Regions:
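Bacterial N-terminal signal peptides that target proteins for export
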Residues: 1-8
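Auxiliary, metal-adjacent structural segments of Zn-dependent hydrolase domains
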Residues: 54-120
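Second-shell loop/turn segments in exported
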Residues: 52-64, 125-138, 159-166, 195-200, ...
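C-terminal motif of bacterial Sec signal peptides marking the signal peptidase cleavage site
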Residues: 18-19
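Zinc-dependent metallopeptidase catalytic helix centered on the HExxH motif
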Residues: 100, 107-187
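Short helix/loop segments within enzyme catalytic domains
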Residues: 181-198, 214-229
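Pan-zinc metallopeptidase signature
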Residues: 207-275
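Acidic/histidine-rich, surface-exposed loop or edge segments in extracytoplasmic proteins
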Residues: 35-61
Length: 275
């Protein structure tokens, strides 16, 4: 019995090494999504008189192609291929420009989603120097984040968005990890875009850069597999998801991986853990 258990453990470890930690899986191509229809795009501009609206339209002359192109990038980052059975199919993306004090938000659900984007924020990004590249970078980045909310899986058995717990940190952490992976944040860990210290449970960029680092260092399909764990685990948690993707062992607990990440990017005085 002991010999059989040892054999099973050895086989499992070999499969884990082959498919997970630190190895390079075949990278699915973005072109595989060219024929996937991400949904009809309907643009509403509620503040056409604002400078922000005029700047946005100058940068985005073809809103449908712009939004659908970003949607395909998001889908490519979240899922292995259009044939994946858990890929959601949206019928409609309603995108609204509006002069308000926030930045952006996604609402709706199922196969109809709504995204609101602030023309006031566009003006702020444009600045006095008229930096259209900055506006485009920010507009794409925000759109990647909101479209992730439209297409991402939702974990089960771990609370709700409103309680600010593991469900919330997964939802917002994945959205910023996808934004980062698509180039919507600076991918250099020394960049000012990356928050220093903190904790993965803070979601957003804290979790986003952590997940991006794991994808770079624990297998280049880590992010897709971590995301898919939301569909595969009946009771989801960050710790359970890490073990689900990377295997058993204390070194694969979320706290151990967070410490390893913090050490690797220079946010901890401790030496990096080596496996």
């Amino acid at each position: 019995m002991k010999r059989l258990s040892l054999f099973a453990a050895t086989v499992w470890a070999a499969l884990t090494l082959a498919g997970c930690a630190g190895t390079k899986a075949p990278v699915p191509t973005l072109e595989a999504w060219n024929d996937f229809y991400p949904g009809d795009v309907h643009l509403t501009d509620r503040s056409p008189e604002t400078r922000g609206s005029q700047i946005w339209h100058a940068i985005v002359p073809n809103p449908e192609a712009y939004i659908q192109g970003c949607a395909r990038e998001v889908l490519h980052t979240l899922y292995t291929s259009p044939a994946d059975t858990v890929v959601p199919h949206l019928r409609e993306i309603r995108y609204r420009l509006e002069d308000y004090g926030g930045i952006s938000e996604k609402s709706g659900g199922g196969d109809h989603v709504r995204i609101r984007y602030s023309t006031r924020w566009v003006e702020r990004c444009f600045g006095n120097d008229g930096d259209t590249a900055r506006v485009d970078h920010e507009t794409r980045g925000v759109l990647y984040h909101e479209l992730t909310h439209a297409y991402q899986l939702e974990p089960k058995g771990c609370g709700s968005y409103g309680d600010g717990g593991e469900y919330w940190s997964f939802i917002e952490g994945m959205a910023d990890a996808v934004r980062l992976s698509c180039g919507g944040f600076e991918q250099d860990f020394a960049s000012s875009d990356r928050p220093r210290g903190g904790h993965w449970s803070k979601g957003y960029r804290h979790a986003g850069y952590f997940l991006y680092w794991l994808n770079q260092n624990k297998g280049n399909d880590f992010l897709r597999r971590f995301h898919r764990s939301a569909a595969e685990l009946p009771v989801w948690s960050w710790d359970a998801a890490m073990h689900h993707v990377l295997g058993p062992g204390e070194q694969h607990s979320v706290e151990a991986l967070w410490r390893e990440y913090q050490q690797a990017v220079g946010d901890s005085e401790e030496q990096p853990v080596t496996e």
